[in-house]
């Protein structure tokens, strides 16, 4: 690979978001996930927060459909902190929803709000199961003797204020779906665009492993995809934008990897220096004892 820095700090859409930002395609993805058959895009209200940025690009899509408020995020690296991020995101979404719908949260009447749903589409290189669930409660620092990890319902009398055991005040559940080629075949079959996205990412990785120059690898991957009718409509019309997105995401991944390597090297060097210093101290102490 070339060592030329290609990091672009302007906020951009991630390729996944760019593809599924179209309400029609987003509706298709939702239908594939849920086994539904919505066709009217006017049923879908996009609620994506425009000021939420991951690294230097935007990888999120949120929307309301029926009684559900869904948050879709794409991740190319596994992040166990997604439920915590989801907590902050949904907090902002609900605050916005309450304001836009003139809901009085101080009223004696119970407010009606959409059901939250959090889906993470993962296509990183780290081996992961086809589907898994991440929970905010997994991150809680300490489970005291009074902590009850069992799920309870609102009607469960053991969850009242006089109970010795207590439930955490909140929980956020994120469902992670592996969209690398070879995973979740049924879902991929139902949503052609998701399948093509996964196939295109696979092509990019293949060419990156073969070529010395990332720009050449991306160009070859785009040409190969178009010739095989993979994301052809998107790639033919938005070639420059797609190339820019891929380079941005690729270099963010490289940036993260480099930072980890730097941290490791710094830690190793600090450890060596501390070891040398400790050896000097022990030598002096031994001389004094003599």
Task: Describe the role of every protein-language-model region.
Residues 1-290:
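Elongated, amphipathic alpha-helical interaction scaffolds
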């Amino acid at each position: 690979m070339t060592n030329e820095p290609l990091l672009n700090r302007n906020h951009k859409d991630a390729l996944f978001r760019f593809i599924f930002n179209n309400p029609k395609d987003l509706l298709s993805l939702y239908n594939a996930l849920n086994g539904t058959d919505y066709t009217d895009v006017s049923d879908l209200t996009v609620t994506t927060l425009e000021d939420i940025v991951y690294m230097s690009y935007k990888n999120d899509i949120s929307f309301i459909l029926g009684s559900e408020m869904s948050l879709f995020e794409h991740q190319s690296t596994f992040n166990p902190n997604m439920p915590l991020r989801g907590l902050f995101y949904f907090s902002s979404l609900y605050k916005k929803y309450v304001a836009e719908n003139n809901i009085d949260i101080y009223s004696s009447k119970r407010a009606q709000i959409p059901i939250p749903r959090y889906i993470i589409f993962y296509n990183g290189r780290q081996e992961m199961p086809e589907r898994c669930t991440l929970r905010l409660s997994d991150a809680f620092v300490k489970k005291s003797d009074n902590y009850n990890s069992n799920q309870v319902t609102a009607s469960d009398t053991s969850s009242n204020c006089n109970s010795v055991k207590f439930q955490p005040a909140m929980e956020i559940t994120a469902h992670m779906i592996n969209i690398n080629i070879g995973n979740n075949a049924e879902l991929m079959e139902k949503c052609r665009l998701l399948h093509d996205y996964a196939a295109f990412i696979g092509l990019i990785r293949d060419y990156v492993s073969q070529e010395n120059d990332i720009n050449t690898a991306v160009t070859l991957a785009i040409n190969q995809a178009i010739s095989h009718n993979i994301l052809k409509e998107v790639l033919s019309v938005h070639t420059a934008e797609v190339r820019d997105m891929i380079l941005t995401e690729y270099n963010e991944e490289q940036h993260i990897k480099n930072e980890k390597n730097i941290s490791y090297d710094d830690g190793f060097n600090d450890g060596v220096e501390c070891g040398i210093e400790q050896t000097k101290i022990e030598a002096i102490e031994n001389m004094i004892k003599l």
